Amino acid sequence: METVQLRNPRRQLKKLDEDSLTKQPEEVFDVLEKLGEGSYGSVFKAIHKETGQVVAIKQVPVESDLQEIIKEISIMQQCDSPHVVKYYGSYFKNTDLWIVMEYCGAGSVSDIIRLRNKTLTEEEIATIVQSTLKGLEYLHFMRKIHRDIKAGNILLNTEGHAKLADFGVAGQLTDTMAKRNTVIGTPFWMAPGVIQEIGYNCVADIWSLGITAIEMAEGKPPYADIHPMRAIFMIPTNPPPTFRKPELWSDAFTDFVKQCLVKSPEQRATAIQLLQHPFVKSAKGASILRDLINEAMDIKLKRQEAQQRELDQEDEENSEEDETDSGTMVRASGDETGTIRVVNTMSDGANTMIEHDGTLESQLGTMVINTEDEEEEGTMKRRDETMQPARPSFLEYFEQKAKENQVNSFGKNVSGQTKNSSDWKVPQDGDYEFLKTWSVDELQRRLSALDPMMEQEIEEIRQKYQSKRQPILDAIEAKKRRQQNF
């Protein structure tokens, strides 16, 4: 377990004072290491010099969506709960905004699952869910919707206390705007109402919590193995997801998930109600999480030490080669001017240790919708809520991705190719013998073309469905208007 000796044990950091905020951040903090990536920026571990307290600092490039960043800071400033990550202050440094937050030494729940390569037990899930519900109860009382609840956004400190984090897509719910109409969140955790853009309120977080409970129990959310585009169509139309092997879980846990995953928001339980559920009320204290936290932190430390040993070994080998090369000068044969050739074997960045841990969440990211004049690649930002899209705006994201895939797939022309991959169609007769005559490069290009083709077919099906559905909706609306006139 990580311990930090405070230089001034009588004083704990609560908020950065005015004097600290007028200084350069390096004068106030010692940045120790990079922890990972959050919404809109990188997160670092640092020490507050005056108190010795460990903090987390999110460094966000100023060219990122400043409106979203300011919203995140505003929401964190307003929150004061032991179940929500605390905010201490922020700085502008060169082209970055530094956001100073509470440090949770054990990392996220998804980090722990990944490091241990084990899912959680019911007891462990109940304890985490209880703290998460208390955090949601507080946020919802403050009329705020988190909108991105998942295991990757539930952080644990070394004592086992769970806290909600990453407010990059959180929203304020005002009395004049009882429901929101923007598609924001991470696809597989989205509530049906969020996907359909029919308006949603705080209980959208409850659906995401139910999906997160399944994620903690099974290691990944439902539909994680299929294309996100298909999942987005399946979530609103299919029955609520359940455990793959229900017999492995207690009736109380199964019922809790069932209460979270009610498709109708009006019938879905609230955070206050779920805190009284038998599964949650039976939860044990945070101390039961310490063993798994210690195990995960030990694994992480051993991996870091192993990586450092490898880097040190590479440095030694490179240093030996560099010394050998630098001590040998070779005169070019027959060249009277004496050309000296020097071989540089030192690789750039040999002393930099970067951890690349691929997780489901990092691959998925967070979906936020673009306004029409934005062209941010790979990240979708929030749509202006005053606009009335003619169709679900999340489709714009996949259409943009399809275009990018087509550019990446077909933009590189190879000499000798007689047929463009974009002209290729999947054989309808099932005869694929001709594939044997193609090169590996050609086969790879054809394979990369399949996803855009599939998305195009799905879009065509969606349009046909909409063309049949809309007249029915219009007829229903017309009948309602006639009834109102009587």
UniProtKB/Swiss-Prot annotation:
Pfam families: Mst1_SARAH, Pkinase. The keyword Metal-binding applies. One of its GO terms (cellular component) is nucleus. The modification Phosphothreonine is found at T182. CDD domains: SARAH_MST1, STKc_MST1_2. It is found in: Cytoplasm; Nucleus. The record marks D325, S326 as: Cleavage. Residues 432-479 form the SARAH domain. Proteolytically cleaved by caspase-3 during apoptosis at Asp-325 resulting in a 37 kDa form. Proteolytic cleavage results in kinase activation and nuclear translocation of the truncated form (MST1/N). It is an enzyme of class 2 (transferase). Its cofactor is Mg(2+). It catalyses: L-seryl-[protein] + ATP = O-phospho-L-seryl-[protein] + ADP + H(+); L-threonyl-[protein] + ATP = O-phospho-L-threonyl-[protein] + ADP + H(+). Residues 288-324 form a coiled coil. Its EC number is 2.7.11.1. One of its GO terms (biological process) is apoptotic process. Residues 305-332 are annotated as: Disordered. ATP binds at L35, G36, E37, G38, S39, Y40, G41, S42, V43, K58. One of its GO terms (molecular function) is protein serine/threonine kinase activity. Homodimer; mediated via the coiled-coil region. This is Serine/threonine-protein kinase 4. The gene is STK4.
